[in-house]
Swiss-Prot record:
Keyword set, alphabetical order: Cytoplasm, Developmental protein, Differentiation, Oogenesis, Ribonucleoprotein, Ribosomal protein
Ranges for region Disordered: 1-21
InterPro entries named among the record's database cross-references: Ribosomal_eS1, Ribosomal_eS1_CS, Ribosomal_eS1_euk
Record PANTHER family: 40S RIBOSOMAL PROTEIN S3A
Species name: Drosophila melanogaster
Reported consequences of knocking out the gene: Flies exhibit disappearance of the follicular cells of the ovary and abnormalities of the associated germline derivatives, leading to failure of egg production.
Location in or out of the cell: Cytoplasm
Family that this chain belongs to: Belongs to the eukaryotic ribosomal protein eS1 family.
Taxon lineage: Eukaryota, Metazoa, Ecdysozoa, Arthropoda, Hexapoda
Disulfide bonds: none
UniProt function note: Essential for oogenesis; required for late follicle cell development.
Recorded GO MF terms: structural constituent of ribosome
Gene it is expressed from: RpS3A
Name of the protein in its database record: Small ribosomal subunit protein eS1
Amino acid sequence: MAVGKNKGLSKGGKKGGKKKVVDPFSRKDWYDVKAPNMFQTRQIGKTLVNRTQGQRIASDYLKGRVFEVSLADLQKDIDPERSFRKFRLIAEDVQDRNVLCNFHGMDLTTDKYRSMVKKWQTLIEAIVEAKTVDGYLLRVFCIGFTAKDQQSQRKTCYAQQSQVRKIRARMTDIITNEVSGADLKQLVNKLALDSIAKDIEKSCQRIYPLHDVYIRKVKVLKKPRFDVSKLLELHGDGGGKSVEAVVSSEGAVIDRPEGYEPPVQEAV
């Protein structure tokens, strides 16, 4: 057994010393998330990212982020028919402190989807892949349920398999025509208004009455080559950049974009 004192413990040692606490948020910047001009609400929130340091560029870490927003928040509408639709927006480019997003998909909330599934009715679903005019390949999921006849005394309202096949074929034809005959902006407007589902419900009345017909989900499978000019055109004003007026030393008013930082002077 060694006899002696432990000098590391008596002096406190390196492990016992106080460490300098650095706030992690001091190395981060806030960026405004901008939605396309097809929605009424342009700024949907803010996002954090580490500040540019060396080869680690902040914009590279922002591109590809996906934001999920309710349609009611995007359209500034309290209608309950809009609150259960969720739109997914993906960050494609960064201009100054603005993150410009594009459509990346749509989905229904889980509680809405599960509340529609009930007994004594037939669930009919169609999955369609179609390409828009501007080259976006989409997979569209449509769902509908058979409706009970008010004059019928039966408890159930099941459809025959031949009727189910006809309704599914009608769903496929309508979705294919609507998607292939419009660009992405026009299609998003149709999804927001739910016009495709209403056309399907109206067209299938002769085969079998339906209710709760919705475009349940939309996935973006393939996109065309990225073009900055098309994204800026989709945002209209380039992402809603705000310009602040700065008065120079000579008294002239200078317009500078938001987030402007003066260059570093090498010599005084």
